[in-house]
């Protein structure tokens, strides 16, 4: 089993548990160049989204694949979710370790007002 398959198995297991709860989830995906975040409701509809690929976020950053960029995405996704009336979410790290950019995004979203 390779690294990607292991990550996807962890992600599937976590998503099933979150699905049973029937709550909104904050989904994080990262690539070497960008960080993406979406708030998805219980009916699998995207409520809010933010990423370093967006011009609004990336133009204030020097580099889009680091911890500072993830913090900017976390703050932006929290603001957009709160605008739509979502304040409580479950954190779906998509099988990535809770470390570095994933942890930075989560911390920034919490500081901006999301609860999880």
Swiss-Prot record:
The name this protein goes by in its record: Large ribosomal subunit protein uL18
Matches recorded under SUPFAM superfamilies: Translational machinery components (SSF53137)
Cellular component terms per the entry's GO annotation: cytosolic large ribosomal subunit
Source domain of life: Bacteria
Entry-linked InterPro entries: Ribosomal_uL18_bac-type, Ribosomal_uL18_bac/euk
Subunit structure: Part of the 50S ribosomal subunit; part of the 5S rRNA/L5/L18/L25 subcomplex. Contacts the 5S and 23S rRNAs.
Keyword Transferase listed: no
Keywords of this entry: Ribonucleoprotein, Ribosomal protein, RNA-binding, rRNA-binding
Any one biological process term the GO annotation gives: translation
Family: Belongs to the universal ribosomal protein uL18 family.
GO terms assigned for molecular function: 5S rRNA binding; structural constituent of ribosome
HAMAP family with a match to the protein in the record: Ribosomal_uL18_B (MF_01337_B)
Annotated function: This is one of the proteins that bind and probably mediate the attachment of the 5S RNA into the large ribosomal subunit, where it forms part of the central protuberance.
